Amino acid sequence: MLRVAVPNKGSLSEAASAMLSEAGYRQRRDSRELVMVDPDNDIEFFFLRPRDIAVYVGRGTLDVGITGRDLLLDAEVEAEELLPLGFAASTFRFAGPVGDFASAEELEGKRLATSYDGLLRGYLAERGINAKVVRLDGAVESSVRLGVADAIADVVETGNTLKAAGMEIFGDPILKSEAVLIRRAGGTTNGTAKEVDVLIRRLQGVLVARQYVLMDYDIRKELVEKAAALTPGLESPTVSPLRDSDWVAVRSMVPKKETNRIMDELYDLGARAILVSSIHACRI
């Protein structure tokens, strides 16, 4: 069986399980379940702390896993990213007292508090910045006021917590993170490469289904090329004859976020009977 690590709690957990369900895999119904077997797909799911998943995968104990890119890099293990999954986006950044710092280079010789010491040490080493990293398990915003650090490196969403602590973001982002599918560096160790490929294709199908819709419309033959420029599809739109030989029916995949704009432009061009359908699953 393919052995897959899934986050058991936190912001990654619910979205990861939802995506796997959309990909056709059975998921747990009770949050207390730690292991679940899906015999129809010959796969076994292990629900683990997100921070531990990269460790289990990197050591080859489990074949693949879903975790955050930031947690993967912070673990400093022999695991690699296979596929970005498009949810749980976050940005890892520097912050310090208002007016104290303008760039990462000014951190030379300073103390930096973080919950991601592995990730931060790697970033500093790549840029030749010599700073002391102070690992904290949480609430790093308080470390400067308490005299533990001169600045911090942490995941930033709105920045409101930093402002309340009298701090501001500075420098370029350290890392832009999101949920990712990972495996042991160099591939799996138990002959499950084919099963991993199937998992990747299914997850890619979910990503495409979430990002695109199917658009159908009727248009006069002489306007097909102009219409196709608006709805090029992934390779090419499908064009079918209608009973009225002056008209054709067109079907194409279009980006979901552009649906209404494209419909308006098609209508202005002369298209009629414009319909939009959701995509529940696909293989590209």
Curated annotation (Swiss-Prot):
Enzyme kind, highest EC tier: transferase
Gene3D superfamilies for this protein: 3.30.70.120, Periplasmic binding protein-like II (3.40.190.10)
Cellular component terms per the entry's GO annotation: cytoplasm
Chief localization: cytoplasm
Bridged cysteine pairs (disulfide): none
Catalytic activity: 1-(5-phospho-beta-D-ribosyl)-ATP + diphosphate = 5-phospho-alpha-D-ribose 1-diphosphate + ATP
Activation/inhibition comment: Feedback inhibited by histidine.
Protein's pathway: Amino-acid biosynthesis; L-histidine biosynthesis; L-histidine from 5-phospho-alpha-D-ribose 1-diphosphate: step 1/9
GO BP annotations, alphabetical order: L-histidine biosynthetic process
Subcellular location: Cytoplasm
Any GO MF annotation of the entry: ATP binding
Ranges in coiled-coil conformation: none
Record carries keyword Transferase: yes
Catalytic activity, EC: 2.4.2.17
Assigned keywords, A-Z: Amino-acid biosynthesis, ATP-binding, Cytoplasm, Glycosyltransferase, Histidine biosynthesis, Magnesium, Metal-binding, Nucleotide-binding, Transferase
Cofactor: Mg(2+)
InterPro entries: ATP-PRT_HisG_long, ATP_PRibTrfase_cat, ATP_PRibTrfase_CS, ATP_PRibTrfase_HisG, HisG_C, N-reg_PII-like_a/b, N-reg_PII/ATP_PRibTrfase_C
Function: Catalyzes the condensation of ATP and 5-phosphoribose 1-diphosphate to form N'-(5'-phosphoribosyl)-ATP (PR-ATP). Has a crucial role in the pathway because the rate of histidine biosynthesis seems to be controlled primarily by regulation of HisG enzymatic activity.
Similarity comment: family membership: Belongs to the ATP phosphoribosyltransferase family. Long subfamily.
HAMAP family: HisG_Long (MF_00079)
Name this protein carries in UniProt: ATP phosphoribosyltransferase
Provenance organism: Pseudarthrobacter chlorophenolicus (strain ATCC 700700 / DSM 12829 / CIP 107037 / JCM 12360 / KCTC 9906 / NCIMB 13794 / A6)
Recorded name of the encoding gene: hisG
